[in-house]
Amino acid sequence: MAITYLLPLFLSLIITSSVSANFQRDVEITWGDGRGQIKNNGELLTLSLDKSSGSGFQSKNEYLFGKVSMQMKLVPGNSAGTVTTLYLKSPGTTWDEIDFEFLGNSSGEPYTLHTNVYTQGKGDKEQQFKLWFDPTANFHTYTILWNPQRIIFTVDGTPIREFKNMESLGTLFPKNKPMRMYSSLWNADDWATRGGLVKTDWSKAPFTASYRGFQQEACVWSNGKSSCPNASKQGTTTGSWLSQELDSTAQQRMRWVQRNYMIYNYCTDAKRFPQGLPKECLAA
């Protein structure tokens, strides 16, 4: 089924503008001993994985709320055992984190897209999906929108998940710790594919994932201050991602994805929560 719906793009005057992406300016490769490379004058970045090591990079900026997008083309062919990630994370032992994780699979089998939200080091809010396209054939855009009211995960402009701020119910929500954007390609064949039953085929190495089109509309955190001083006050900025929510059309698209492509939802896993489902699940 063709996907024609795109979420509206909102601009704000008090955020960093989404100028043309340039990896040389916006990110730094943090590990991999040369396996991560910036190419084409900063327009393309590749990560590779072999038996010795994977690789990764991070944004130079920290954000306290933002809308971060990346075009990615995942490892083709037999990617079993590999994990490609795009996420926001704060440092420390009680960290906040918002995850996209792409779990590789055997040739011809679809990737699993794993999402999760951590607050103060506590996660357990997983939702997993199969994608409705081949994520290795072309670049596709993955976006995390994080504002004081909600977190929205989108794929090519189509929302797949919304995690609302339900602190009124006692549910933790990440809103106090600035986070960087991170991405990595690494070996996780002890769990990534069929619970670790399928191992990485190192004869296919090096495995490579490609990135372009990094966009950051965000409240940049620098020297203990935000570029959006009123961002934590809900509803103070209208007409931007800081107050963006899903309209009825977007909600319909999200329900279509969840109905047809969601393969795991912690909110329906009664065996995992014998004392009762999390409160935010009952309120949804």
From Swiss-Prot:
Keywords: Apoplast, Cell wall, Cell wall biogenesis/degradation, Disulfide bond, Glycoprotein, Glycosidase, Hydrolase, Secreted, Signal, Transferase. InterPro entries: Beta-glucanase/XTH (IPR044791), Beta_glucanase (IPR008264), ConA-like_dom_sf (IPR013320), GH16 (IPR000757), GH16_AS (IPR008263), XET_C (IPR010713), XTH (IPR016455). It catalyses: breaks a beta-(1->4) bond in the backbone of a xyloglucan and transfers the xyloglucanyl segment on to O-4 of the non-reducing terminal glucose residue of an acceptor, which can be a xyloglucan or an oligosaccharide of xyloglucan. Disulfide bonds join 219-228, 267-281. GO terms for molecular function: hydrolase activity, hydrolyzing O-glycosyl compounds; polysaccharide binding; xyloglucan:xyloglucosyl transferase activity. The active site is at 97 (nucleophile), 101 (proton donor). Glycans are attached at residues 105, 230. Residues 1-21 form the signal peptide. Contains at least one intrachain disulfide bond essential for its enzymatic activity. N-glycosylated; essential for its enzymatic activity. Optimum pH is 6.0-6.5. Optimum temperature from 12 to 18 degrees Celsius. Cold tolerant. Residues 22-211 form the GH16 domain. One of its GO terms (cellular component) is Golgi apparatus. It comes from the Eukaryota. Its EC number is 2.4.1.207. Its main location: secreted. Xyloglucan binds at residues 101, 114-116, 124-126, 190-191, 195, 272. SUPFAM superfamilies: Concanavalin A-like lectins/glucanases. Induction: In response to mechanical perturbations such as wind or touch. Induced by auxin and brassinolide. Highly expressed. Predominantly expressed in green siliques. Expressed in young expanding leaves, trichomes, lateral root primordia, vascular tissue, abscission zones and elongating hypocols. Following wind stimulation, it decreases in the leaves of wind-stimulated plants, while it strongly increases in sites around cells of the pith parenchyma, between the vascular elements, and within the epidermis. Belongs to the glycosyl hydrolase 16 family. XTH group 2 subfamily. This is Xyloglucan endotransglucosylase/hydrolase protein 22. It comes from Arabidopsis thaliana (Mouse-ear cress). The gene is XTH22.
